[in-house]
Amino acid sequence: MDVMNVPVDSERDNPGDKVETQSDKNHLPKASPSQSQSPVNTSLHNGDGKDNGVATEPVENKQILSERSVTRDDYEKGKTIVSSLALSSISGKDGSISSQNAEGLSSSSNRPLDVNDALSYLELVKYYFSERREIYNRFLEIMRDFKSQALDTLGVINRVSELFNGYPQLIEGFNTFLPSGYKIEVQLDSSNTSVVRVGTPMHPLPQQGVQSTLPVAPSNEDQRTMESTSPTDSQPQPSAPNLVSSTENEKPRVDFNYAIAYMNKVKARYPPNSDTYMEFLGVLRTYQKAQKSIFEVRARVAEIFKDSPDLLEEFKLFLPDNVDSTEPSTPNVQKSPNRLPPVGNFSLPPSAPVREKRNRPAHSAQISRSISKTSRMYRQTAEEPLNSYSLHVYPQKITAPTSPYAATQEELLAFTTIRQHLPDTLAFHKFLELLHLYREKLLDKTELLNSFSKLVRNDNLTLWFSEFIRWSDNPILVKNEPVDERVYLPETFECISLTYRKLPDSWKQDKCSGRDDLDNSVLNDDYISVAPKPSHVKNIMHHENQYLQALQLVEDERYDYDRVLNTTESAIKILANFCEPTIHEHLETALQELERSKRIIKNALIIVYGKEHANLALDTLFKKLPTAAPVLLKRIKTKDQEWRRSKREWSKIWRQIEKKNAQAAFDDRYCRIEGRDRRGLSYSRILRDIDDIYQRQKHRIDGAKLGFQFTQVLCDSLIFLNILRLSDAQLTNSSFYSYADKGRISAVLKALLSQFFGIPLPREALETNLASENIESVKKHRDGLSKIFIRPESADNSNNTNVSFQTDETQTEDETMSDIHPDDVENHSKSKFLGEESKNIIGYNFFGNATMYVLFRLICVCYSRLEHIKLFVESSTIYASSTGGYENILNICEKYLKGSCSRLEFRKYLQKFNNETCYMICSIERLLKVIFYRIHEILLDPKLGQLLLLFESDGANSVTTPREQMVYRNHVESILAPESKIFNMRWYPLEKRLCIQQLLPADLTMHDFENPAKAFMYYVDSYAISHITEGVDLMQVKMPFLRRSLQRISQQGYLAGRGSGRLHSLFNEHFCKSNLQLFFSTDTYVIFFEPNTENVYINSYNLWVDQSSQSKKQNRTTNWRRWLESDEGWRKSKANTDIKFFSETTLDQCIEAM
């Protein structure tokens, strides 16, 4: 049959095929000019490379092929696929052995696979199916799947056998692409029917002399079993000759898992670092690489494992069957020049790592490599002739496993079912990893079942797998035995020597039952080792600070420059010797000298050119020394000069950094104080400290009671004046704030100290600070805050909530109440309870938010440090006379804050005291900066300014009632809303004591009562005012309003009020005035109201109802009118005449008729 040849048209190629062809052509050899011409005239070859006499002839007239015929494009695609398959099967894309066709793919005759054989087979396929394009395309698809490892070897054999049914020459010719150990034979059975027989590494085809003795009985059951079994799932079987000679004495085959278990057993017996284990691995590697006899390996292993007969017996399972019965001197043994098969079917561990690693599941590539290595034992040496018979596929029958380590039929069925259910090979590998983890006892049955259920996501299969692994859902019973509470105190044990103590009999544990006499004589159960701890040795740890780190960074940079410059300088000296004109005369001596100094030159080239190009430059230097040396020398000199110039520039910066940080780096005391202040004086840390104490009091931890969380005695008023003196010095030298801000900050600090702590300040000093803001001189001593913070004139400019409140004395006077007996009401003796007895000297109260609390705490910290220094200097006569006393310290601090004294001089002066307390003043600059920052934050927030105004009007009264304090607190809460947490700073002027308490809405304003009567009166006062009663759970309070009568302000109404400019009326829509006075008895709780007193509450919410409320109101009106006009309304039980009369009569007529 003639085959028409069509010239290749590259423009018609598929772009995807072009890319694949281009990537695969990199592996193909260059074609001769005769092969590159078109049309191609090529002779066809069979699988053996012999000419079959069929050749193509050129056709002069081009004919248009039908769609069913094979075109030239299809042939080129096929050439690309089979060529790349042949080459990639020998070596992968990266040069390594592929996992599908591992260990050298070759033909069945042990002849290396050639690309020409693959192309010849493609020519043969094209010859037979030139008019049947669909079969040719199906063949290319099979080859693509085989190349991408989508099909295993048995799968591609089955598909090719079905595709080429009736073409035995093509079926047997496919042996060209099969890995070693796999072989296809087409033979004729006794009934003149062609039979396709497949040989695998685990099931090799029997020899021809035994074929007549052991016929293969085909069956449908065997065929199904063979099709569902992959090479990795196949079980080892004895070959046909061994079955004929001896079936009873056959040695059981071992699988891959047993090989891993054997290696782990050897590791457990002999550690990986031991000489025995390394010698055993060396024997295995020698057997793999060198041409050693299997008898030599056995003798060497027997010598290594002479003390472990069990390991030697297990090792014999991995040897071939004829080793035990045949001696090395037998003349029948034929020594093949090829390499011998490996011992067993396990891969050798690497020799580089010496430490033992954790066992991991074997990769699929390792399994395939080990199987392919084992397949060499069964490689056939004789080649079967090709016959032309019809095709009937009858796979080889699988016999029952005979190895005790082999899988049973139930396990084979289980693995087959699971693999068919899993979507891909990756999921099956995950399943194998789970089994490996379970085998290594890293997973129990429950964890294995849970992981398997997540992997397969099939309830039936999970239930079957649980029965297969015999999982039981019985709960695990753990004995609840108490832990031994013995305390390990080696100091109490008997001392045997300096480092050993003898254990008491009660501490001795039960000995292991597996010990023998040798173990008991060697192992120690009576003594323990204790490290000695001399009393004079202290563990001194060195703490690095930021200044020391800066110096270390400078030294690292200087070291890098020195290392680079020393390397380049040495390289320049060496290369200068190779640039002489007479280098050609003694070139060999120069190369030897270059070899000795290769490391120095390479380091210099890496610095100049980088690692990537350094090796290339070094190779060029060795090859062309006379020409390359001057070029490299010039380049290295140029970079050396640049780096030296850069080092000189950086040296100036390094000197400045060292001068700035040298003293501070070694002043460890200052670094510790600075780091402590940076953490302890932070905003969040101060709030967290008081909140921790509050939580301990609230939950009664360690018997704590509710009360103040912070208390400090501030008895020296002169220290407050010193704080103001240092703050003025700091503000004078500060460039962070403007001139106006400096005056306001100083005025706020002075006014706060004078009003809250009662510090008598000179009036001129306060007026001077206020004049900096163009404020009029103060009239009274306590009007400083009112001059700094402008009081809001109306509710329009205030930041209050929608409930208006009165800050004057009206409300406090109207909300006056007392506790009298009902019998005293007639006598109007309530003045007794309104007199001086209701007044208590409780000190000044200042309610503020977290910012105010942090400011007071910072002032206390500054006071505490100055007080400690003053007490230390006054108590020590030596420092008082030598350093000038406390006043001299203040002068030095003032000079330091103003900038006339350097930081180094200031620290040297403080070091004279040699006291940690005095040295705390070194961070006074940072402390004052934080105080100024908090005051500036108060100036920027209008709400905080209102808090100071409230304190000036309500809080700064030493003689007040509890009810007035509650009203003052409610005012503060309304200003700070929605912020719920407030702080109460209380100053007791007689005791000179400051107490701070954190308050939540449910906490009481006052908590220290002398007797229960005082507590009851406090409750009555809280109940009488218009705000929420303190100490009452709001969840238990039932409001006396119907829910349907309450209407809220909608967002639409709010927007309407804002657009109309009437937003102030929206906030003031609630009006409340409490003037009602009542009296009740403490015994009977009978309430008596005072005449001519009342409470007024006005709610104008109807002005701001939304559209939905209006529609509801109209609907109610319409429904009411409909009912009124109906028969059930006013017409009910009336006569028709009356109805007609009332319908026609107007309201005026009705009135006149009446």
Swiss-Prot record:
Question: Which intervals of the chain are annotated as region Disordered?
Answer: 1-71, 91-110, 199-249, 321-376, 797-824
Give this protein's Gene Ontology molecular function annotations.
Answer: transcription corepressor activity
PROSITE patterns linked to this entry: PAH (PS51477)
Location in the cell reads:
Nucleus
- UniProt biased composition (Polar residues): 32-45, 100-110, 323-337, 365-376
Q: What is its main location?
A: nucleus
The cellular component terms of Gene Ontology attached to this UniProt record, alphabetical and capped at eight, are: chromatin; cytosol; nucleus; Rpd3L complex; Rpd3L-Expanded complex; Sin3-type complex
Q: Where is the composition biased (Basic and acidic residues)?
A: 9-27
Q: What is this protein called?
A: Paired amphipathic helix protein pst3
Alphabetized InterPro entries for the sequence: HDAC_interact_dom, PAH, PAH_sf, Sin3-like, Sin3_C
Recite the UniProt keywords alphabetically: Nucleus, Repeat
Q: Which gene encodes it?
A: pst3
Where would I find the PAH domain in this sequence? 111-181, 252-322, 403-472
Question: Which GO BP terms, alphabetically?
Answer: double-strand break repair via nonhomologous end joining; negative regulation of transcription by RNA polymerase II; transcription initiation-coupled chromatin remodeling
Gene3D superfamilies annotated for this entry? Answer: Paired amphipathic helix
